[in-house]
Amino acid sequence: MAKMTKIEIQKRNKERVNLFLDGEYAFSISAELVYKESLKVNSEINPEKLRTLAESENFMRCKESALRIIEKTYKTEKEVRDKLKLKEYDESSIDKAIEFLKKYNFINDGNYTKIFIKDKLRSMGSQKIKYTLLRKGICKEIIDEELLNLDKENEKDVAFDIAQKKYNLIKNKETDTYKISGKLYRYLISKGYNTEVTSQVIKKVMAVDVDDF
């Protein structure tokens, strides 16, 4: 069993503390953990206590990293996990950090999905939105539930505006209506609109142009 012979606050980082066991430097931990665990000079530390300290320290560092990750932009659970794994934190610490973030609603895949859909509907179709969210680690059930509430007519209106702008660019270089329709079709599909919406929108765009003419 080792004895705690010195607890030294680091000069460059007052939130970190160096621990000395039996007269020799052992490792450093956060000052918060020293107070939390009531560590004192001359106290005896058994191997189990050392292991617990190491685990607690890893978790605290992992949690701090997780908070920095979400500091500027809202993230999905998968995005946070992936970034923590890149920093080589152990799975147990990552799980605890994620649990902490969820507890205080710092990450919420349901809320993220709502915000993402509302924002991206102005520039892409529901299929691309779904694919993008799946890649971000959002479960299919959450995505499908939110997309069910989607205003289909609003999606068509947005698709029409996008298609109209593209059409105005294409018709300056192309006069063949069949080729124009083909280019519009591929463009809208690439934007994530399904075949039904795409076909309806193209017909409307072409019809509007004929009426204007």
Curated annotation (Swiss-Prot):
Primary location: cytoplasm
InterPro entries, per the entry: RecX_HTH_1st, RecX_HTH_2nd, RecX_HTH_3rd, Regulatory_RecX, WH-like_DNA-bd_sf
Single Gene Ontology BP annotation: regulation of DNA repair
UniProt keyword annotation of Cytoplasm present: yes
Subcellular location: Cytoplasm
Pfam families named among the record's database cross-references: RecX_HTH1, RecX_HTH2, RecX_HTH3
Gene Ontology cellular-component terms listed: cytoplasm
Highest taxon in the source lineage: Bacteria
Gene3D superfamilies recorded: Winged helix-like DNA-binding domain superfamily/Winged helix DNA-binding domain
Family statement: Belongs to the RecX family.
Name of the protein this chain belongs to: Regulatory protein RecX
Organism expressing this protein natively: Clostridium beijerinckii (strain ATCC 51743 / NCIMB 8052) (Clostridium acetobutylicum)
